[in-house]
From Swiss-Prot:
It is an enzyme of class 2 (transferase). It catalyses: RNA(n) + a ribonucleoside 5'-triphosphate = RNA(n+1) + diphosphate. This is DNA-directed RNA polymerase subunit beta. The keyword Nucleotidyltransferase applies. Pfam families: RNA_pol_Rpb2_1, RNA_pol_Rpb2_2, RNA_pol_Rpb2_3, RNA_pol_Rpb2_45, RNA_pol_Rpb2_6, RNA_pol_Rpb2_7. Gene3D superfamilies: 2.40.50.100, 2.40.50.150, 3.90.1100.10, DNA-directed RNA polymerase, subunit 2, domain 6, RNA polymerase alpha subunit dimerisation domain, RNA polymerase Rpb2, domain 2. GO terms for molecular function: DNA binding; DNA-directed RNA polymerase activity; ribonucleoside binding. The RNAP catalytic core consists of 2 alpha, 1 beta, 1 beta' and 1 omega subunit. When a sigma factor is associated with the core the holoenzyme is formed, which can initiate transcription. InterPro entries: DNA-dir_RNA_pol_bsu_external_1, DNA-dir_RNA_pol_su2, DNA-dir_RNAP_su2_dom, DNA-dir_RNAP_su2_hyb_sf, RNA_pol_bsu_bac, RNA_pol_bsu_CS, RNA_pol_bsu_protrusion, RNA_pol_Rpb2_2. One of its GO terms (cellular component) is DNA-directed RNA polymerase complex. HAMAP family: RNApol_bact_RpoB. Keywords: DNA-directed RNA polymerase, Nucleotidyltransferase, Transcription, Transferase. NCBIfam families: PRK00405.1 (NF001616), rpoB (TIGR02013).
Length: 1372
């Protein structure tokens, strides 16, 4: 029975949140396609192999074809890979076929001579864990999804910024997934240019001609024609065309042929007049003789008598040209339809600028522009041009690119066509011309319809392709160098290029990141992150404001709140709670469909492009009892704008108010009352919360806590309906009923992780939440992870808070905290540090891990065992030896006395130095684990043997528990059949003379449980029953044998030794658990961006207290609220106070023996929920008592974002709990007992301890390492460095005239090498006088000047005395 929970949400969310790791896991499953080879789709790994193979040699005499691939089983499981520093990977085997051909020299036809098929080992491929991570070299890493510009087409303009005339210049770009980019842009003279691969621009018509179009074809495609007749009388007649409207004035009266006038001379021709002209059936209209001057010819004009070309297409028409044509007998002129209409003459002007006569010349010109160094021939140029956009080998638009092209240009092509067609290019130019001429809006490149997600599967796929292409070159070279007929496929294929590319990607790529494993939330968030950075993406220096800003299309897809605060702001974002990524990589969000103002149960996921034009109502729109929108006008979104729309126009409705934010932001209660900047900090800081020793879920939650905890992978969940057979702190065994794990009899064992080190050194431990015999269903939590309680995220603690100043200790966001919190380990966390020591084979001899260390006292060795390794459970502090190690020293020059001693005692073996592993400063804790790794062939020491014995015993026990659970599951399955059946033989007991059951007695359940499983064979009188039992026992034996095989391989791995790097003899890893109590200087935070540093830990008795004597836990500064505008923390405080007090009151009623009926009525009255009322009525008294008892620490409330508790709800709870409605209380000063002058806002707030711990930041140095060049101390804790004294600090000391102090700081304490040595000698002698020398930085400056050719020499000035020596104390 779980806790009684008050849910304040009013909106019923019909759609469960999709699994939070689906994006990562599904993408890699799709990439790997581990199933049957025959059914694989041409995508992912299969698609990569198919795109590169077949590989043919240069002469086409041999071809290497791909058949299939198989993914093998990984050699080591995940825990082994983490512990041994290995990569969790599986071997890939590919089946390839080498086909050798005979080529006929005359005809060139090929006939198959030989076919060889072979399966080849093709390296390994990292596998994804079920948590969506990769284990690379023993550390868990995440491949972050990349958000990049989608392939396809985009139309843009420069907003008048490029040219000084401020003219808006339009451009168009076609972006493929792989291949040459194609750019079309206009200049300020309206000439259209094309750029291929961002090279030099050329007139766009060159590209059209290279595609095979003539001048006339180009003009016909882009322009309509109109025809003019040249009258011998000198008149100009325009031929009427129905589909062409002339925006002009009448030259003469236009008559309808029946005596009526349609338009009078000089009057404009309206659309109505145009209709009348068409109806009148007029063929021509007389226009002004100069009308066509300045227009352009649509075709070449040829003299019909002589065949001479009188004028070319695109030539400008002049009065003289018209006269010449009339004289040549030309009566009809085809003219481009451009004047005064939407279509401008820009393309005709481009054509005039283009001097290439035909297709061949155009292709050669393109080749010359793109390959300026190599001389072109027409054949090479034609082949090169064909490969640019038309060849699938060189150009891949991708299904996404084709989909976007179809969508934008209105084409109906299959998404499988992944090259560019001539029609695509021509249509793109037509749209570009229309945009320029109509001054239409450009595409928004920041719109999510133009940005897509490249998930992990696609990123790995691209890397695999790069590796295969490199391998392809090597294979082709081998084929041409050797006689192919004598080779086998494995002689040609070398998978090393692929392995190298994968290793580089997973190890060093910007998108392969060390997983943030601070807590369960940080893990999930890291896997749901989208990055615009990385290869093929943006750089943070070049990214402008627009790409970082929140966009209207982000609604429901990308969280507007959660993003880093630094230079990456807006470039790294998170998916929202309900968002999914479709097959094309576009982010989709779900909506409920509305028809005629009524809600339906249909839900559809839409990407940003498909949402355009939809009218979307908000999730909180009022709905009546019939499921219709209650208000006539509702707030709705249309193309990113928020409008009031009529309910009949609304087509969709949001699923949930939380669908617009990410999971981190959805965990902040009353998010709607927080300023966005503080909400951003709140969502980021929850990821930094350290899991505590005892987790406690928030009293005021949002309802998302369970989803995050369950989907994070930190919990263990039941995979189906079943029964828990065994449960302890380290292991849970469950037998499932629905056919899961048939080879194991439906029994699955879960090993719980204990004191496991996370990537951030926090302690990862799991606790069982189930008990043996418990019946579970799918999704039930079997074990909690770190920072999780009862399957809900629990990152902090519920503390009683007071908002009041306290003697300046909470000035500037400082925090005053009660000593009770430290004393009761409320905020104590465990951190695990790992230390490693390696014994190598050196030139002077092997290093040795031993207890026998020269010049080390027994006191330092007290915790080491015989092998020189520290025992588990020992408490250690800085400078303690963890592992004793000695290293051979080089031969040193010996004195005659030492030579004599060596000769007498033979003490050669002592020529070693102590290189033991010691505890570094700042670490104090307990040894929790030691791992010893030996070479396979190496000799094992005593500690290794002890570890192996211990591990083997553990595996034996696990096997016994597993087999026992298998037997219990078998008994349960047989019980219904066997109980009541007669036994054929008498069953003796364990003791002498004891009889369990006589022959003929019926089988009982107790007897069935008491008998060993094997004893059931041949036990019953019924032959049918015996046969059924025998069949079941055969299955049982097979399952036991299967388990034995698994556990035998585990035992073998324990004893087989390890693969260590070359030169390494032995490696020891020591884990120390460090307990970090809350300390002054630790950073703490709430969930609303309210962060601060602990300034004082006050004794409990001095803290402000309530009238009943209870002290508060934490005191915060009230001035931290108004200016930050995060009022959500105040609302949380008030609601938390009401929930805590009401819960306490109900528990007190229970303790005081109140009648059950009264208590039930009181609980129903507090919760005011039909669901809770029904649940309370169904509970028996004992279950009800337990449920009410759990309310003692407070009623757990769920207040979802944008749909949470209202002010009225909070006030009603506070008043019901018997407190003042304003949430303020009288507090008393703990030091004096006096009442504080003003009443104070108090309540319960959820407080987190962040991983910025003072114990891990502070350190001290006396002497230590120095920089080689400057001889100044190094900086930072990791280098055991010093504190830098900068120029501002020097100014401060100068201002006080502290000359001796300054001299000491700038010389002996910094980089005066000789002065340091002298200082040490003087301190030893007790002669405390400072004698400063020349700082090394001065020498560095001199050398730098020398490098510039300036010779610098130092001279002692004559007659100058050295300054008088002054003692340190007298100087002060």
């Amino acid at each position: 029975m779980g806790q009684l929970t008050k849910k304040f949400g009013k909106i019923d969310v019909s759609l469960p949140i999709p699994h939070l790791l689906n994006l990562q896991v599904d993408s890699y499953v799709k990439f790997l396609q581990e199933g049957a080879t025959e059914r694989r789709h041409d995508e992912g790994l299969e698609g990569v192999f198919r795109s590169v193979f077949p590989i043919e040699d240069f002469n086409r005499t041999a071809s290497l074809e791909f058949v299939s691939y198989e993914v093998g089983e990984p050699k080591y499981d995940q825990p082994e890979c983490i512990s041994k520093g290995l990569t969790y990977e599986a071997p890939i085997r590919i089946k390839v076929r080498l086909v050798v051909y005979d080529v006929d020299e005359d005809s060139g036809n090929r006939t198959i001579r030989d076919i060889k098929e072979q399966e080849i080992y093709f390296g390994t491929l990292p596998l994804m864990t079920e948590k969506g991570t990769f284990i690379i070299n023993g550390t868990e890493r995440v491949i972050v999804n990349q958000l990049q510009r989608s392939p396809g087409i985009i139309f843009e303009h420069d907003s008048g910024k490029t040219h000084s005339s401020r003219k808006v210049l339009y451009s168009c770009r076609i972006i493929p997934m792989r291949g040459s980019w194609l750019d079309f842009d206009f200049d300020h003279k309206d000439i259209l240019y094309v750029r291929i691969d961002r090279r030099r621009k050329m007139p766009a018509t060159i590209l059209f001609k290279a595609m095979g179009m003539s001048k006339t074809d180009i003009l016909d495609y882009f322009y309509k024609k109109e025809f003019y007749r040249l009258d011998p009388m000198g008149r100009l007649m325009w031929e009427v065309q129905k589909d062409m409207y002339r925006k002009d004035s009448a030259f003469v009266d236009i008559e309808d042929g029946k005596g009526g006038t349609i338009v009078k001379a000089g009057k404009p021709i309206t659309k109505r007049a145009w209709r009348l002209i068409s109806e009148a059936g007029l063929e021509t209209i007389e226009v002004a003789p100069d009308t066509i001057e300045g227009m352009f010819l649509a075709e070449d004009i040829v003299n019909p008598a002589t065949g001479e070309v009188l004028a070319e297409a695109a030539d400008e028409i002049t009065a003289s040209l018209v006269e010449n044509l009339r004289e040549a007998g030309i009566s009809r002129l085809p003219v481009l339809h451009t004047k005064g209409l939407e279509t401008s003459s820009s393309l005709r002007d481009t054509l005039v600028l283009d001097k290439t006569p035909d297709m061949e010349a155009a292709q050669v010109e393109i080749y010359r522009r793109l390959r300026p160094s190599s001389p072109p021939t027409p054949e090479i140029a034609a082949s090169f041009f064909d490969n640019l956009f038309r060849s699938a080998d060189y150009y891949d638009l991708s299904p996404v690119g084709r989909y976007k092209l179809n969508q934008r240009l209105g084409i109906d092509q299959s998404v499988d066509l992944r090259t560019l067609t001539d029609d695509d290019i021509l249509r793109a130019i037509r749209v570009l011309l229309h945009l320029k001429d109509s001054h239409g809006p450009a595409d928004d490149i920041d719109h999510l319809g133009n940005r897509r997600v490249r998930p992990v599967g696609e990123l790995v796929e691209n890397q695999y392709r790069i590796g295969l292409v490199r391998m392809e070159r090597a294979i082709k070279e081998r084929m041409s160098l050797q006689e192919v007929s004598t080779l086998m496929p494995h002689d040609l294929i070398n998978p090393k290029p692929v392995a190298a590319v994968l290793k580089e990607f997973f190890g060093t790529s910007q998108l392969s990141q060390f997983m943030d494993q601070t807590n369960a939330l940080s893990e999930v968030t890291h896997k749901r992150r989208l990055s615009a950075l990385g290869p093929g993406g943006l750089t943070r220096e070049r990214a402008g404001f627009e790409v970082r800003d929140v966009h209207t299309s982000h609604y429901g897809r990308i969280c507007p709140i959660e993003t880093p605060e630094g230079p990456n702001i807006g470039l790294i974002v998170s998916l929202t709670t309900y968002a999914k990524v479709n097959d094309f990589g576009f982010i989709e969000t779900p909506y409920r469909i509305i028809r005629e103002g009524a809600l339906t149960d249909d839900i559809k996921f839409l990407d940003a492009s498909r949402e355009q034009g939809e009218v979307v109502a908000q999730a909180n729109a009022a709905v009546d009892a019939d499921g219709k929108l209650a208000d006539e006008y509702v707030t709705a979104r249309v193309r990113g704008d928020v409008l009031m729309s009529h309910r009949d126009e609304v087509t969709l409705m949001d699923i949930s108010p939380s669908q617009m934010v990410s999971i981190s932001a959805a965990l902040i209660p009353f998010l709607e009352h927080d300023d966005a900047n503080r909400a951003l900090m709140g969502s980021n800081m929850q990821r930094q919360a350290v899991p505590l020793l005892r987790s406690e879920k928030p009293i005021v939650g949002t309802g998302m806590e369970g989803d995050v905890a369950r989907d994070s992978g930190a919990c263990i969940l039941a995979e189906g309906p079943g029964i828990v057979r065994y449960a302890d702190a380290t292991r849970i065994i469950v037998s499932y009923e629905n056919g899961l794990y048939p080879d194991r009899g439906g029994v699955r064992a879960y090993d719980l992780q204990k004191y496991h080190k996370s990537n951030q050194n926090s302690c990862f431990g799991q606790r069982p939440t189930c008990h043996p015999g418990q019946i579970v269903k799918k999704g039930d939590v079997l074990a909690d992870g770190p920072g999780i309680e009862d399957g809900e995220l629990a990152l902090g603690k519920n503390l009683v808070v007071a908002f009041m100043p306290w003697c300046g200790y909470n000035f500037e966001d400082s925090i005053l905290i009660s000593e009770r919190v430290v004393k009761e380990d409320v905020f104590t966390s465990i951190h695990i540090e790992e230390f490693e020591v390696v014994a190598r084979d050196t030139k002077l001899g092997p290093e040795e891990i031993t207890r026998d260390i020269p010049n080390v006292g027994e006191d330092m060795l007290r915790n080491l065992d015989g092998s020189g390794i520290i025992r588990i459970g020992a408490s250690v502090k800085p400078d303690d030896i963890l592992v004793g190690k000695i290293t051979p020293k080089g031969e040193t020059q010996l004195t005659p006395e030492e030579k004599l001693l060596r000769a007498i005692f033979g003490d050669k073996a002592r020529d070693v130095k102590n290189t033991s592993l010691k505890v570094p400063p700042g670490i104090e804790g307990t040894i929790i684990d030691v791992k010893v790794f030996n070479r396979r062939s190496g000799e094992k020491d005593e500690r290794t043997r002890n570890i192996e014995d211990y591990e083997t015993a553990r595996i034996d026990k696990k096997e016994q528990d597993h087999v026992r659970a298998l037997g219990d599951a078998l008994r349960d399955r047989l019980a219904d059949t066997l109980v009541g059946k007669q036994i054929a033989v008498t069953l003796p007991g364990k003791r002498k003379g004891e009889v369990l059951a006589e022959a003929g007695a019926p089988m009982t359940r107790e007897l069935l449980d008491a008998l060993p499983v094997k004893r059931l064979a041949g036990l019953f009188k019924s032959r049918e029953v015996d046969e059924m039992v025998d069949t079941a026992l055969e299955d049982y034996d097979r399952q036991v044998a299967f388990l034995k095989g698994i556990y035998d391989s585990k035992r073998e791995k324990v004893t087989e030794g390890d693969d260590l790097p070359p030169g390494v003899i032995k490696m020891v890893k020591v884990h120390i658990a460090v307990k970090r109590k809350l300390n002054v200087g630790d950073k703490m935070a709430g969930r609303h961006g309210n962060k601060g540093v602990v300034s004082c830990i006050l004794p409990e008795e001095d803290m402000p207290f309530f009238a009943d004597g209870r002290p508060v836990d934490i005191v915060l500064n009230p001035l931290g609220v108004p200016s930050r505008m995060n009022i959500g923390q105040i609302m949380e405080t008030h609601l938390g106070w009401g929930a805590k007090e009401l819960g306490r009151q109900l528990a007190e009623m229970l303790d005081s023996g109140a009648a059950m009926a009264t208590l039930r009525h009181e609980v129903k009255d507090v919760f005011r929920s039909a669901t809770i009322a029904k649940l309370v009525d169904e509970m028996d008294d004992e279950t009800f008592r337990k449920a009410v008892s759990k309310l003692r620490t407070g009623i757990v409330t769920k207040t979802p974002v944008f749909d949470g508790a209202s002010e009225e709800d909070i006030w009603s709870w506070i008043e019901r709990a018997g407190m003042d409605g304003d949430g303020k209380t009288v507090l008393y000063d703990g030091r004096t007992g006096d009442k504080f002058y003003n009443r104070v806002t108090t309540g319960v707030m959820y407080i987190l301890k962040l991983h910025h711990l003072v114990d891990e930041k502070i350190h001290a140095r006396s002497t230590g390492p120095y920089s080689l060049v400057t001889q100044q101390p190094l900086g930072g804790k990791a280098q055991f460095g010093g504190q830098r004294l900068g120029e501002m600090e020097v100014w401060a000391l100068e201002a006080y005239g502290a000359s001796y102090l300054l001299q000491e700081f700038l010389t002996v304490k910094s980089d005066d090498v000789t002065g340091r040595v002298k200082m040490y000698e003087k301190i030893v002698k007790g002669d405390n006088f400072l004698e400063a020398g020349l700082p090394e930085s001065f020498n560095v400056l001199v050398k730098e000047l020398m490098s510039l050719g300036l010779n610098v020499t130092l001279h002692q000035e004559e007659g100058k005395k050295r300054p008088k020596r002054v003692g340190f104390m007298s100087a002060l």
